[in-house]
């Protein structure tokens, strides 16, 4: 009887040890979360004005891709580079990310750059919510107005022409602080 009890205790302890070691390895949860973020971020995204953001989220936390603006004087696609949190929180928070586009390509050099910073939010209606800064080269006297500020929400669903027109008419994201003063 004693041998049976000892064997039963040994089996129980082994089971507890295996269960504890499987759940005590947070790196497995983190790796799974990172893979979900990587797969979710990668793809084609559209903002409310119809600009197209094509991105690849790499396992090392880098972002690479192109950006095609639907507004301003930008022509064709521009290279983008950025970073994302490749070890995101596992508490349901968004995944922090950011990228930059220098508005120079084979067609045009606008002597400006835009940086977006925000969060990727996973789910059935995945989105990337961002704030952006657009800085243009200016003279020292005009440096005070060299940077515009705005926000974009990107989704994987291209907006309709009607919703783009409505956003433009509403003045969404023109980023010019002087427009608010002049109205």
Curated annotation (Swiss-Prot):
Gene3D superfamilies (alphabetical): Avidin-like
Binding site for biotin: 67, 78, 116, 132, 144
Primary location: secreted
Entry keyword Transmembrane helix: no
Cited InterPro entries: Avidin, Avidin-like_CS, Avidin-like_sf, Avidin/str, Avidin/Streptavidin-rel
Residue ranges occupied by any Avidin-like domain in the UniProt entry: 37-159
GO cellular component: extracellular region
Functional description taken from the UniProt entry: The biological function of streptavidin is not known. Forms a strong non-covalent specific complex with biotin (one molecule of biotin per subunit of streptavidin).
Family statement drawn from the similarity comment of this UniProt entry: Belongs to the avidin/streptavidin family.
Name of the protein described by the UniProt record: Streptavidin-V2
Lineage: Bacteria, Bacillati, Actinomycetota, Actinomycetes, Kitasatosporales
């Amino acid at each position: 009887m004693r041998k049976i009890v000892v064997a039963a205790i040994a089996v129980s302890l082994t089971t507890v040890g295996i269960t504890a070691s499987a759940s005590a390895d947070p790196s497995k949860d983190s790796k799974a979360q990172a893979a979900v973020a990587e797969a979710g971020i990668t793809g084609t995204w559209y903002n409310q004005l119809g600009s197209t953001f094509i991105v690849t989220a790499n396992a090392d936390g880098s972002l690479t891709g192109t950006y095609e603006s639907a507004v301003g004087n930008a022509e064709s696609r521009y290279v983008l580079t950025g970073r994302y949190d490749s070890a995101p929180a596992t508490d349901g928070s968004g995944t922090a990310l950011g990228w930059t586009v220098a508005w120079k390509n084979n067609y045009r050099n606008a002597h400006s750059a835009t940086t977006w910073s925000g969060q990727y939010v996973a789910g059935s209606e995945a989105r990337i919510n961002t704030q952006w800064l657009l800085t243009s080269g200016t003279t020292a006297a005009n440096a005070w107005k060299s940077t515009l500020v705005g926000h974009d929400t990107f989704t994987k669903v291209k907006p309709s022409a009607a919703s783009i027109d409505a956003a433009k008419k509403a003045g969404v994201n023109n980023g010019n602080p002087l427009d608010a003063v002049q109205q």
